[in-house]
């Protein structure tokens, strides 16, 4: 099994601004290790003679002419919001510690 450490799980949680109990950290450590083991199994697949494909759906890039369209009326929008501050819509804080997200 891949060696994913609890410290690595805690580090990813910190970067993701998530908090886990010690039991959750242990569980995620085992689960992530199993996932990485399954992905590493792909290295063993013999792909000789299999043509390279970038997009199996065979879609093409569909381009259209870029046309400017009238947006929302700012005054009507601002009149409809419950809270505003300095000309912006004020929403509840998402990060409890005021982080850099």
From Swiss-Prot:
The keyword Acyltransferase does not apply. It catalyses: L-glutamyl-tRNA(Gln) + L-glutamine + ATP + H2O = L-glutaminyl-tRNA(Gln) + L-glutamate + ADP + phosphate + H(+); L-aspartyl-tRNA(Asn) + L-glutamine + ATP + H2O = L-asparaginyl-tRNA(Asn) + L-glutamate + ADP + phosphate + 2 H(+). GO terms for molecular function: asparaginyl-tRNA synthase (glutamine-hydrolyzing) activity; ATP binding; glutaminyl-tRNA synthase (glutamine-hydrolyzing) activity. The keyword Protein biosynthesis applies. GO terms for biological process: glutaminyl-tRNAGln biosynthesis via transamidation; regulation of translational fidelity; translation. It comes from the Bacteria. It holds the Pfam family GatC. Keywords: ATP-binding, Ligase, Nucleotide-binding, Protein biosynthesis. Its EC number is 6.3.5.-. HAMAP family: GatC (MF_00122). Allows the formation of correctly charged Asn-tRNA(Asn) or Gln-tRNA(Gln) through the transamidation of misacylated Asp-tRNA(Asn) or Glu-tRNA(Gln) in organisms which lack either or both of asparaginyl-tRNA or glutaminyl-tRNA synthetases. The reaction takes place in the presence of glutamine and ATP through an activated phospho-Asp-tRNA(Asn) or phospho-Glu-tRNA(Gln). Heterotrimer of A, B and C subunits. Belongs to the GatC family. This is Aspartyl/glutamyl-tRNA(Asn/Gln) amidotransferase subunit C. It comes from Lactococcus lactis subsp. cremoris (strain MG1363).
